[in-house]
Amino acid sequence: MKTLVTLLALTLAIPAFAQTEIKVDSPAPAFSVKDASGKAHSLADAKGKWVVLEWYNKDCPYVRKHYDSKNMQGLQTKYMAQGVTWYTVISSATGKQGFLGNADVAPNFTKEGAKPTAVLIDTDGAMGKAYGAKTTPHMYVINPEGKVVYAGAID
């Protein structure tokens, strides 16, 4: 009986830890996440603007493809020139693949030639979980009304 109760409790608890999957046309989840310098950035900061959220992992071969070809930097430049807010998000936990410490962020992105609005450090993964970001580069485009109009891969 004790085993059955434990099994039931675990079964009921699993959905509580599942990631949310954001659907197109749904409101974008609010966030407030700090960059490497400690400055907080939020979705509310970009209210009334287009926003791109780009999940980044320096060791991901698909991220490498887009950064080594300068594709991602070109998109950042093009759309930011049109007033888009571009947040690059690092959700890698300390010591895990793709992790960048605060002191490593600026040199890494200078080397990449990338100039997003800000690089957000989501080491606890809360923002990634709120958006359901599972891979890199995982992209979300949010319209000025705060709705997700694209969610998925860049290719």
Regions found by a protein language model. Give the residues of each.
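Positively charged n-region of N-terminal signal peptides that target proteins for export
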Residues: 1-8
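Sec/Tat signal peptide C-region and signal peptidase I cleavage site
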Residues: 14-19
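A short beta-strand-turn-helix
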Residues: 31-51
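Short, glycine-anchored, charge-dense loop/turn motifs used at functional sites
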Residues: 38, 60, 139-155
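Short active-site neighborhood of thiol/selenol oxidoreductases, capturing the structured segment around
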Residues: 44-64
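Loop/turn elements at helix/coil->beta-strand transitions in domains of secreted/extracellular proteins
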Residues: 48-51, 81-87, 114-117, 144-145
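Structural microenvironment flanking redox-active thiols in thiol-disulfide oxidoreductases
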Residues: 64-112, 123-128
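Short, internal strand/loop/helix patches
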Residues: 106-143, 148-149
